[in-house]
Amino acid sequence: MDTQGVATDPQLQQFIEIESQKQRFQQLVHQMTEVCWEKCMDKPGPKLDSRTEVCFVNCVERFIDTSQFILNRLEQTQRSRGAFSETMTD
């Protein structure tokens, strides 16, 4: 199979996009785990105490909120740049 066939195969493109999304999600989970572990875990034990559990829950929620805010902001920036470039070409 030649590379042009790969570039135009919609099923392959969809598969690649799905795998890329999975990879990005795994990277996000890894990053979130690392950040929250460093922030909340004083010393590993046989089970989490309530303070540590609350810290993890809050950390994960803030991490998700922050990630969503950044994604929304990037989308707004891209839309405004697209609208700006369209007005420049008219």
UniProtKB/Swiss-Prot annotation:
Description of how the protein assembles with itself and partners: Heterohexamer; composed of 3 copies of TIMM8A and 3 copies of TIMM13, named soluble 70 kDa complex. Associates with the TIM22 complex, whose core is composed of TIMM22.
Subcellular location(s) per record: Mitochondrion inner membrane
Parts forming coiled coils: none
Family, as annotated: Belongs to the small Tim family.
Function: Mitochondrial intermembrane chaperone that participates in the import and insertion of some multi-pass transmembrane proteins into the mitochondrial inner membrane. Also required for the transfer of beta-barrel precursors from the TOM complex to the sorting and assembly machinery (SAM complex) of the outer membrane. Acts as a chaperone-like protein that protects the hydrophobic precursors from aggregation and guide them through the mitochondrial intermembrane space.
UniProt GO molecular function: metal ion binding
Entry keyword set: Chaperone, Disulfide bond, Membrane, Metal-binding, Mitochondrion, Mitochondrion inner membrane, Protein transport, Translocation, Transport, Zinc
A Pfam family matched in the record: zf-Tim10_DDP
Protein name listed in UniProt: Mitochondrial import inner membrane translocase subunit Tim8 A
GO terms (BP aspect): protein transport
Gene responsible for this protein: timm8a
Lipid bilayer topology: Peripheral membrane protein
Gene3D superfamilies named in the record: Mitochondrial import inner membrane translocase subunit tim13 like domains (1.10.287.810)
Extent of motif Twin CX3C motif: 36-59
Domain notes: The twin CX3C motif contains 4 conserved Cys residues that form 2 disulfide bonds in the mitochondrial intermembrane space. However, during the transit of TIMM8A from cytoplasm into mitochondrion, the Cys residues probably coordinate zinc, thereby preventing folding and allowing its transfer across mitochondrial outer membrane.
Domain of life from the UniProt record: Eukaryota
GO CC entries: mitochondrial inner membrane
Disulfide bridge partners, by residue number: C36-C59, C40-C55
